[in-house]
Regions:
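Beta-loop-alpha module in the N-terminal Rossmann-like domain of NAD(P)-dependent dehydrogenases
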Residues: 42-104
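C-terminal glycine/acidic-rich active-site capping loop/insertion
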Residues: 25, 240-316
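Rossmann-fold dehydrogenase core element
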Residues: 100-118, 138-142
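Predominantly a Rossmann-like dinucleotide-binding segment in NAD(P)-dependent oxidoreductases
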Residues: 118-204, 335
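N-terminal Rossmann-like dinucleotide-binding module
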Residues: 1-43
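Contiguous beta-strand/loop segments that form the cofactor/metal-binding neighborhood of enzyme cores
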Residues: 173, 180-256, 295-307
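C-terminal helix-rich "cap/oligomerization" subdomain common to oxidoreductases
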Residues: 1-2, 7-8, 23, 39, ...
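Hydrophobic residues in well-ordered beta-strands that form the structural core
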Residues: 87-88, 112-114, 143, 224, ...
Length: 342
């Protein structure tokens, strides 16, 4: 049966895309808006606050697309109202705000999660399967790179570049995807982090460059480099997992644009007979945010909130990612390595 979804906020870079995804998703018969949606909200039913969602037909789920300073406030009200809720990453400015949402969810039994959409990416699914199959053996080394278009190209006056509204910079907003995927693909929690950050543009007060070295509880060590640093192209984005028997590289963006491909080199059959193997793992197309992946993400969350199946991530994953980010910031401030709890 088609459900009813509420989109909350509107002042988020992904809000318009998610609105299109929700509108075209076959699992929803109606979209209700709450917040500031401007010209995009003209054709939809609207409510002035969360209480208004309870005055009409029941809402099956909500998706919060708001500023980081506002998102946890919206989410808290939704969970207390008994509405299963997705919150755009990184959910909040601090891990304490995420922990509060987890506590409310535990006490009310209302499910919530964040939009770690890349967990559904075909390249990510394949990498995780390959590691599970022993293709690279015991994991020893990880690298992640999230280098993207410069702050100048992204509008320095945007709320994303002010600590009061965003909470942090490149590590907080974009590299949090990389932070999450390392843990997800490796099936291993972080143990330590050491980092340096830099803010080189005077008009912003969050980091535009971050470099973090980390340890995983399984013994591997790794590195994440993130930067708003490209004056022309969009991205230089990749991940590498190395083990005792091989390595796998995911080249997500390069000079030619998006090229979702895996490069596998392994001493394990059936890979050992070739020097290396390239596999194309493109993201499925489609409109809205994330194309078909975005649609599938909403469908899976709706089914999970109804108890039909488990979801691909939860509030604990959001908490782990933000604790890593905060640990990196603390390390950059103190010059010391920070221990991370699981």
């Amino acid at each position: 049966m088609a459900g009813r979804i509420a989109l909350i906020g509107g002042d988020n870079p992904h809000a318009k895309g998610w609105l299109e995804t929700a509108t075209t998703c076959p699992d929803f018969s109606e979209v209700v808006l709450c917040g500031d949606w401007g010209d995009h909200g003209g054709r939809y039913d609207t409510v002035s606050d969360i209480k208004g969602l309870g005055q009409g037909p029941s809402v099956d789920m909500a998706l919060v697309c708001a500023r980081n300073v506002d998102a946890p406030k919206w989410a808290k009200q939704l969970l207390q109202a008994g509405i299963p809720t997705l919150v755009e990453k990184p959910v909040a400015r601090t891990s304490a705000e995420v922990a509060e949402l987890n506590a409310i969810s535990a006490s009310t039994g209302v499910f919530w999660s964040t939009c770690f959409l890349n967990r559904l990416h075909p390249a990510v699914v394949k990498m995780r399967d390959l590691l599970d199959e022993g293709t690279i053996g015991r994991l020893v080394s990880v690298e992640g790179r999230m280098v993207t278009s410069s702050v100048a190209r992204r509008d320095p006056g945007h709320w994303l570049f002010q600590k009061e509204t965003a909470g942090g910079g490149i590590l907080h907003w974009l590299a949090i995807h990389t932070v999450d995927l390392v843990r997800f693909i490796a099936r291993c929690n972080y143990s330590t982090v050491s980092a340096q950050t830099a803010t080189l543009i005077e008009s912003i007060d969050v980091e535009e460059i971050a470099s973090a070295t980390f340890g995983l509880q399984g013994g591997a060590i790794g590195h994440i480099h993130a930067a708003y640093a490209l004056p022309r192209r969009y991205g230089d984005i990749s991940m590498v997992f190395r083990g005792e028997k091989g390595d796998i590289t995911w080249q997500s963006w390069d000079y030619a644009g998006r090229k979702d491909r895996l490069i596998i080199q392994s001493a394990v059959e059936p890979w050992a007979s070739q020097e290396y193997v390239e596999l194309a793992c493109p993201a499925p197309g489609g409109g809205g945010y994330g194309g078909e992946m975005g649609t599938r993400f909403l469908q899976l969350f709706l089914a999970s909130s109804r108890g039909d199946q488990s979801f691909v991530c939860d509030g604990n994953d959001a908490l782990s990612a933000l604790r890593f980010v905060e640990g990196a910031y603390k390390s950059a401030q103190t010059g010391k390595r920070v221990e991370l709890s699981s």
